[in-house]
C-alpha cells in the first residue's frame, strides 16, 4: 500500500489504535491457547543477551511497542501466530540457573512471544463499548466493515500505471506541511476532514448554507498558493455579486496578499484582463469571462492548478462551468477541482452529470441532521400558511373563463382538449397536447383546419402564463400582461388576427378589464390575499425586534412584476424600507440592474440602508448576510434546489424564521413534492452506491514521496488586505487602455503535431513525416580563431610514406616489381556507368557538388547512342556523311569550266546514299501496305483503287496538263469516279513510280540510271503523283505538323547530328520547295550551268521524307533540265 494512501485512509488514527485493531482478531485465539499452554521453564534473573524474535504476519506493517527489560521477561507457551495482552497467572517459577535445562532460552519458531501492549493500549481496550453511528444516527452494522479491514473504495489503485508528474513548478520547501488557519476560532471536525480530502482529490462539497464552505475553499487556496511558484488559482461564481463577496472572505481568512488577487468580469476591457493574467495569481471571476479569456489566449490553461467552482449544481448541460473544465482538460491533466454547493441536484442523473463534467472523485456531503454539524446549525422555524382565492379573484376568473370558452371549444371539437374549465390551462399542458395532435390526427387534417388550430394553440399558450400570475401572484401582474396583449394587437396595421380580435371584442373580456381598472385606482387595493398577509408579517416582525435592531428580511418572488408590486405596497407600510433586487436583463416594463448597482444594493442592505430586500432568483444563491432573521417565500417552487437555497439565506449566525405563503391546491402539492425529493436525494448521495466517481481524472499534484503534515496555526493577514477594502478590480487608466490587445494565442497540448499532416498517414494512423530541420547559420563572433601552424595541418614524413604505400602502390607483378600509381595515371572514365548513379552511403551523405556531377554525367550518357555509348571515342568525331550529299559545283567567275569538286563528293558515294534511301523507303511502303490490307476487308475496293492508279499512270504519261499548284485541284476534280477513297491512304500518297514492281526483273541492278530512260518526261507533262496527293484529306499545314512531330521524336531518340541545317520560317517552309528523291537522282548527271530560275519537283511522300539526308540550300542554275523519276523498287535487294 502506498504511504500517501495509507496516510489518507488512516492518517487521523493513532499508532496504538492501529495495533489494537490488528490484534482484535487474535484475542479469542490467544485466550484459548493460554488454557492449553505447557508449564514454562524457570530461569534466574540477571542480564542476558536479547532473544531473537521470530517474525509474524504483522511485523512488516505494524511497529510493536518496546518490550520490558530482560529481567521481567517470562516466556509463555502461545498458539502459533497469536498475540496476548496479559500473561497467564502462575507462569513464573523462581529457581537457579543450574536447575534450568540447556534449552531454557530457546523459543520455538512456531510459538513466538508477542510484545506486551502498553498501559495506554489497555486503557483503550476498555473504551470499546462506544457505539459508532452514521450521519443519520443509526448504528453501523458490525459485519459491514471489519475492524482490521480497509475500506473497499481506494483513492489510488496499485495495479494502475504510475501517474505522470505534474508540470507545475512546486515550492519544495513548503510541500512538507499544509496549513490549517485558526483565525476563526475552534476547529470544526467536518471542515478539517473536508479540507484534508480536498487537497488531494477532486471533491464535491455539499453542505447546508451557513456552515463554512467559503472557509474550506480559502484554506485549500492558501495551501496551493504556498505549494506552487507561478501557477494560477481561479475562483468562479455565477454572478459578480457572489464573486465580489468571496473576495473579501478569502482575503480575510487565507491571508493571500491583495496585490496577487484580482476581480475580472465582462465589464473589464480585454486589454486590462490580459495584463492581469500576466501579473496576478489569484482570480475571482464569472465562468463566462474565464471561458472568453481561455478561448482568446489571454489565460494559459496549463498554468491553472486549482479551480474552485461555487454553486456547482449549475455544472450541467451546456453551462459555462462545463465548457471551462472541458477546455482546460484538453491541455492539462494536472488540475485540482473543488466544487461547492448546498444542493447537488434533484435527481440521480443530475448529480452524476456534475460528477462527470467536473471529474469528481470524492464527495463530502452533510445534512442538517448529521451528527458532526448538528451543533453548528441554528434552528429555523418554518411556518407554512395557505390561502384561498379572494372574492375579487373569483370574479375575475369567472369573466376570463367565459371569454376563453369559444377558443377552448374549438380544441374540444377536434378532440384535442377535454377540460371544461379554461382556468386550468397550463403552458406545458398545451404544448404537450399540440405535439400529440400533430403526431396523430393533425398530421392528416385539412390545411385550413391545421392553420386554425395552430393559431388557437398560440393564443392560449400566451394567455396560460397570465392565468398562473392571477392564481399565485395577484391581479396586478395579470392585468399588466393582458394590457400588453391588447396593445400589441391594436397596434398592428390592418385587421390582424381574427381570433385575437374576437377575444378582445368579447363582452366578458371588456367587462373584466374595466372592473380591474376601477380597482387599481384605489390605493389600498391588494390584488392577492398573500400581499395582505405579507405586509402584516413584516410589520409585526420589525415591531417585535425594536426600533434600533439590525434585523433584516428577504422576500423571494419568481417574477419581476410581482417583485415590483410587492415593493410598491411595502414602502407604504411603517418601519419598512424595501428595495428590489433583480438581474441585468431588461424586461418590457422595467430595466435590469447592472452588476455595479447589484453590489451597491447588497452593501446598502448590509449596512442598514434597506431592511427588506425583495429579490428574484438572482438572490437565491450565495448571498451571505448574517443579519437576515426572516425569509418570506411569496411563491413555492417545485425545485428542491431553489427551495433550499431560499431557506439557506437565514439561520446562518443565529436562529431564523421562514414563512411560506402557499395557495391551496396545486402550489401546496408542489412544495410537498420538492421537500420529499430533497430528503430522498440526500440519502442517495450519502450512500454513494448509485454514482460512478472519476478517479482517472483526479491526478495527484503533490509527489507521492512527499507526505504533507498539518500545521495548525494562526495565519497572519497582510496589512494591505485590511487597509484597502475596495474590490481588487483593475483600474481603467489611459495608459492601460491605449495598449493594443495581443493577437489570439492558440494553446496546444503537449506533444501535439502542428502543421500539415499527410492524408495517407492520417488514415492508417501513422505519424506524419516531419520536414528536415534546416541547419541554422553559425552565430557571428567577435573574435577570430587562431591560425594553426603549417606543421599541424600537413602530413608528416611518416604519414606521407604510409599514404603512398597504401594508396599509390599495387602488389608485385609477375616480374617481382612494385607498380606505382601516380595521380596522373588515374583514369576518371574507367567506370562510366557507376559515375552516373549515386551509390549507397552509411554515415556520410552525398554533397551538393557530387549530386550535380552525377546528374551531369547521367545527362551526357543519355545523349549518346545506346549502341555506341561505351565505345571510345565518345562522340568526339562526327560520323555523319552530310558532306557526301550531292551539291552543285560552284562555277568560277570568268571561266566556262566547272569548278573542282570537293573531296567528299564522288559518284560511288552518291549512288550508295541513293540506294540506301530507296531501300528504306521501299521497306516502309511494304510494311504500311501489309498493315492496311490486313486491317481492311474491302478487297473489291482495293481492286478499284489499283485500277484508278493504272488510269492515273496512263494519264501522267500521255497528258499535257502543265505542272503547278493549280493542277492539284483539277486533278482532284477529275478523280470524281465511283471508286472508294479511304482517308489517310498511304498507298495513294506515294506516286505510281514508287509502287510499280512489274519491271523489277528486267533491270540489271545498277545505279547508272539507264533503266529510267523510258520514264523521262518534260517539265510540262502532268504526272499522277501531282494530283493524287491532293486527294488526301489532310491539309498541307497538318501534314507539315505531323511531319515535324515525327521528325522531333526521331531526333530525340537518336544521337544529335554534328551539323544542324538552319530552319526556315512558316513563309519559307513549304512542301513545294522541298527536294524530291527524283531530283537528287537527276543531279548526279547534271553539269554545272549558269544561273537560272530554280525549279522544284513534285512533292514526294511525307513518310519517306524522314529517311532522307538533310540538304543544303540549292543555288540557282542557268538552264532548266529534265527531271528523272527513279523507282526505288529497282534498288531493293533481297
Swiss-Prot record:
Residues binding ATP: 207-214
A single GO BP: interstrand cross-link repair
EC identifiers of the protein: 3.6.4.12
Basic and acidic residues: compositionally biased ranges: 985-999
Catalytic activity: ATP + H2O = ADP + phosphate + H(+)
Location(s) in or outside the cell: Nucleus
Superkingdom of this protein's organism: Eukaryota
Domain Helicase ATP-binding: 194-362
Record field: compositional bias (Polar residues): 93-106, 1022-1036
Main location: nucleus
Cystine connections: none
Residue ranges of every copy of the Helicase C-terminal domain listed in the record: 538-699
Keywords, sorted A to Z: ATP-binding, DNA damage, DNA repair, DNA-binding, Helicase, Hydrolase, Nucleotide-binding, Nucleus
Acidic residues bias locations: 1-18, 941-956, 1000-1017
Segments for region (Disordered): 1-126, 938-1134
Coiled-coil stretches noted in the UniProt entry, renumbered to this chain: none
Motif (DEAH box): 310-313
GO molecular function, one term: four-way junction helicase activity
Any one annotated GO CC term: nucleus
Database matches in InterPro entries: FANCM/Mph1-like_ID (IPR039686), FANCM_DEXDc (IPR044749), Helicase/UvrB_N (IPR006935), Helicase_ATP-bd (IPR014001), Helicase_C-like (IPR001650), P-loop_NTPase (IPR027417)
Comp. bias (Basic residues): 967-984
Role this protein plays: ATP-dependent DNA helicase involved in DNA damage repair by homologous recombination and in genome maintenance. Capable of unwinding D-loops. Plays a role in limiting crossover recombinants during mitotic DNA double-strand break (DSB) repair. Component of a FANCM-MHF complex which promotes gene conversion at blocked replication forks, probably by reversal of the stalled fork.
Protein family membership: Belongs to the DEAD box helicase family. DEAH subfamily. FANCM sub-subfamily.
Subunit relationships: Interacts with the MHF histone-fold complex to form the FANCM-MHF complex.
Protein name (record): ATP-dependent DNA helicase MPH1
Species lineage: Eukaryota, Fungi, Dikarya, Ascomycota, Pezizomycotina
Gene name per UniProt: MPH1
Amino acid at each position: 500500500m502506498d504511504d500517501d494512501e495509507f496516510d489518507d485512509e488512516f492518517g487521523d488514527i493513532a499508532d496504538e489504535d492501529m495495533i489494537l485493531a490488528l490484534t482484535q482478531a487474535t484475542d479469542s485465539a490467544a485466550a484459548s491457547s493460554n488454557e492449553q499452554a505447557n508449564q514454562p521453564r524457570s530461569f534466574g534473573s540477571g542480564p542476558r543477551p536479547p532473544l531473537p524474535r521470530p517474525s509474524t504476519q504483522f511485523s512488516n506493517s505494524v511497529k510493536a511497542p518496546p518490550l520490558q527489560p530482560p529481567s521481567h521477561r517470562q516466556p509463555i507457551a502461545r498458539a502459533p501466530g497469536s498475540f496476548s495482552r496479559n500473561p497467564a497467572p502462575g507462569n513464573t517459577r523462581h529457581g537457579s540457573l543450574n536447575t534450568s535445562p540447556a534449552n531454557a532460552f530457546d523459543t520455538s519458531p512456531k510459538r513466538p512471544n508477542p510484545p506486551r501492549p502498553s498501559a495506554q493500549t489497555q486503557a483503550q481496550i476498555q473504551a470499546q463499548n462506544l457505539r459508532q453511528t452514521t450521519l443519520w444516527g443509526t448504528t453501523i452494522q458490525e459485519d459491514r466493515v471489519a475492524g482490521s479491514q480497509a475500506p473497499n473504495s481506494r483513492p489510488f489503485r496499485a495495479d494502475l500505471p504510475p501517474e505522470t508528474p505534474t508540470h507545475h513548478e512546486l515550492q519544495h520547501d513548503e510541500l512538507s506541511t499544509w496549513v490549517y488557519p485558526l483565525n476563526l476560532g475552534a476547529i470544526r471536525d467536518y471542515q478539517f476532514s473536508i479540507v484534508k480530502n480536498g487537497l488531494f482529490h477532486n471533491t464535491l462539497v455539499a453542505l447546508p448554507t451557513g456552515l463554512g464552505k467559503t472557509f474550506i475553499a480559502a484554506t485549500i487556496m492558501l495551501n496551493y498558493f504556498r505549494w506552487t511558484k507561478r501557477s494560477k488559482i481561479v475562483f468562479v461564481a455565477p454572478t459578480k455579486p457572489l464573486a465580489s463577496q468571496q473576495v473579501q472572505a478569502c482575503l480575510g481568512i487565507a491571508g493571500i496578499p491583495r496585490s496577487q488577487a484580482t476581480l475580472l468580469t465582462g465589464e473589464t476591457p480585454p486589454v486590462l484582463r490580459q495584463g492581469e493574467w500576466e501579473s496576478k495569481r489569484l482570480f475571482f471571476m464569472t465562468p463566462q469571462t474565464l471561458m472568453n479569456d481561455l478561448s482568446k489566449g489571454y489565460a494559459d490553461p496549463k498554468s491553472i492548478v486549482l479551480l474552485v467552482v461555487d454553486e456547482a449544481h449549475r455544472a450541467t448541460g451546456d453551462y459555462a462551468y462545463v465548457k471551462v473544465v472541458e477546455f482546460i482538460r484538453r491541455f492539462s491533466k494536472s488540475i485540482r477541482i473543488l466544487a461547492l454547493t448546498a444542493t447537488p441536484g434533484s435527481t440521480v442523473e443530475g448529480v452524476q452529470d456534475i460528477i462527470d463534467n467536473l471529474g469528481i472523485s470524492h464527495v463530502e456531503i452533510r445534512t442538517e441532521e448529521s451528527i458532526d454539524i448538528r451543533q453548528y446549525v441554528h434552528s429555523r422555524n418554518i411556518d407554512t400558511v395557505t390561502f384561498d382565492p379572494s372574492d375579487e379573484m373569483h370574479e375575475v376568473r369567472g369573466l376570463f373563463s367565459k371569454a376563453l370558452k369559444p377558443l377552448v371549444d374549438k380544441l374540444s371539437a377536434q378532440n384535442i382538449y377535454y377540460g371544461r374549465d379554461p382556468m386550468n390551462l397550463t403552458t406545458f399542458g398545451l404544448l404537450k397536447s399540440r405535439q400529440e395532435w400533430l403526431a396523430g390526427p393533425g398530421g392528416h387534417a385539412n390545411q385550413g383546419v391545421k392553420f386554425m388550430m395552430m393559431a388557437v394553440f398560440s393564443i392560449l399558450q400566451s394567455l396560460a402564463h397570465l392565468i398562473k400570475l392571477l392564481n399565485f401572484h395577484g391581479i396586478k401582474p395579470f392585468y399588466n400582461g393582458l394590457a400588453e396583449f391588447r396593445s400589441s394587437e391594436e397596434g398592428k396595421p390592418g385587421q390582424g388576427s381574427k381570433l385575437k380580435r374576437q377575444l378582445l371584442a368579447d363582452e366578458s373580456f371588456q367587462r373584466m378589464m374595466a372592473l380591474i381598472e376601477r380597482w387599481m385606482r384605489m390605493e389600498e387595493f391588494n390584488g392577492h390575499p398573500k400581499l395582505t398577509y405579507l405586509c402584516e408579517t413584516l410589520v409585526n416582525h420589525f415591531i417585535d425586534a425594536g426600533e434600533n435592531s439590525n434585523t433584516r428580511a428577504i422576500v423571494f418572488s419568481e417574477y419581476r412584476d410581482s417583485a415590483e408590486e410587492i415593493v410598491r405596497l411595502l414602502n407604504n407600510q411603517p418601519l419598512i424600507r424595501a428595495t428590489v433586487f433583480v438581474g441585468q436583463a431588461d424586461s418590457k416594463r422595467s430595466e435590469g440592474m447592472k452588476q455595479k448597482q447589484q453590489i451597491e444594493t447588497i452593501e446598502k442592505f448590509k449596512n442598514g440602508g434597506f431592511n427588506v430586500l425583495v429579490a428574484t432568483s438572482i438572490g437565491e444563491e450565495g448571498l451571505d448576510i448574517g443579519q437576515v432573521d426572516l425569509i418570506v417565500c411569496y411563491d413555492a417552487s417545485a425545485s428542491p434546489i431553489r427551495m433550499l437555497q431560499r431557506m439557506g439565506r437565514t439561520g446562518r449566525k443565529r436562529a431564523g424564521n421562514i414563512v411560506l405563503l402557499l395557495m391551496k391546491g396545486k402550489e401546496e402539492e408542489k412544495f410537498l413534492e420538492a421537500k420529499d425529493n430533497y430528503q430522498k436525494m440526500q440519502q442517495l448521495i450519502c450512500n454513494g452506491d448509485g454514482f460512478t466517481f472519476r478517479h482517472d481524472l483526479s491526478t495527484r499534484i503533490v509527489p507521492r514521496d512527499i507526505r504533507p503534515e498539518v500545521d495548525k496555526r494562526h495565519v497572519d493577514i497582510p496589512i494591505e488586505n485590511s487597509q484597502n477594502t475596495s474590490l481588487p478590480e483593475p483600474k481603467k487608466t489611459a495608459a492601460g487602455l491605449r495598449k493594443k490587445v495581443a493577437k489570439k494565442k492558440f494553446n496546444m497540448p503537449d506533444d501535439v503535431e502542428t502543421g500539415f499532416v499527410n492524408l495517407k498517414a492520417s488514415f492508417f494512423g501513422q505519424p506524419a513525416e516531419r520536414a528536415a530541420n534546416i541547419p541554422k547559420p553559425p552565430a557571428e563572433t567577435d573574435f577570430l580563431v587562431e591560425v594553426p601552424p603549417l606543421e599541424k595541418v600537413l602530413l608528416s614524413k611518416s604519414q606521407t610514406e604510409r599514404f603512398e604505400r597504401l594508396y599509390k602502390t599495387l602488389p608485385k607483378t609477375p616480374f617481382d616489381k612494385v607498380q606505382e600509381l601516380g595521380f596522373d595515371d588515374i583514369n576518371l572514365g574507367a567506370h562510366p556507368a557507376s559515375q552516373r548513379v549515386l551509390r549507397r552511403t552509411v554515415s556520410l551523405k552525398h554533397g551538393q557538388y557530387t549530386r550535380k556531377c552525377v546528374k551531369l554525367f547521367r545527362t551526357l550518357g543519355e545523349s549518346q547512342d545506346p549502341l555506341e555509348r561505351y565505345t571510345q571515342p565518345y562522340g568526339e568525331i562526327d560520323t555523319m556523311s552530310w558532306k557526301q550529299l550531292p551539291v552543285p559545283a560552284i562555277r568560277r567567275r570568268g571561266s566556262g569550266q566547272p569548278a573542282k569538286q570537293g573531296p567528299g563528293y564522288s559518284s560511288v558515294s552518291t549512288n550508295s546514299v541513293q540506294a540506301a534511301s530507296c531501300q528504306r523507303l521501299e521497306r516502309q511502303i511494304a510494311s504500311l501496305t501489309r498493315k492496311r490490307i490486313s486491317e481492311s476487308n474491302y478487297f473489291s475496293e482495293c481492286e478499284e483503287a489499283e485500277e484508278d492508279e493504272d488510269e492515273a499512270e496512263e494519264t501522267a504519261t500521255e497528258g499535257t496538263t502543265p505542272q503547278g499548284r493549280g493542277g492539284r485541284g483539277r486533278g482532284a476534280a477529275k478523280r470524281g469516279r465511283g471508286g472508294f477513297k479511304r482517308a489517310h491512304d498511304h498507298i495513294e500518297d506515294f506516286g505510281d513510280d514508287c509502287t510499280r514492281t512489274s519491271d523489277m526483273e528486267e533491270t540489271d541492278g545498277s545505279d547508272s540510271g539507264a533503266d529510267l530512260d523510258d520514264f523521262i518526261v518534260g517539265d510540262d507533262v502532268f504526272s499522277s503523283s501531282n494530283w493524287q496527293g491532293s486527294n488526301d484529306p489532310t491539309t498541307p499545314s497538318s501534314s507539315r505538323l505531323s511531319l515535324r512531330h515525327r521528325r522531333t521524336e526521331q531526333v530525340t531518340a537518336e544521337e544529335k547530328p554534328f551539323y544542324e541545317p538552319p530552319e526556315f520560317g512558316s513563309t519559307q517552309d513549304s512542301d513545294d520547295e522541298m527536294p524530291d528523291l527524283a531530283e537528287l537522282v537527276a543531279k548526279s548527271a547534271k553539269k554545272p550551268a549558269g544561273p537560272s530560275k530554280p525549279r522544284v519537283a513534285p512533292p514526294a511522300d511525307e513518310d519517306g521524307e524522314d529517311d532522307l539526308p538533310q540538304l543544303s540550300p540549292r543555288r540557282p542554275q542557268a538552264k532548266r533540265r529534265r527531271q528523272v523519276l527513279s523507282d526505288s523498287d529497282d534498288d531493293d535487294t533481297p
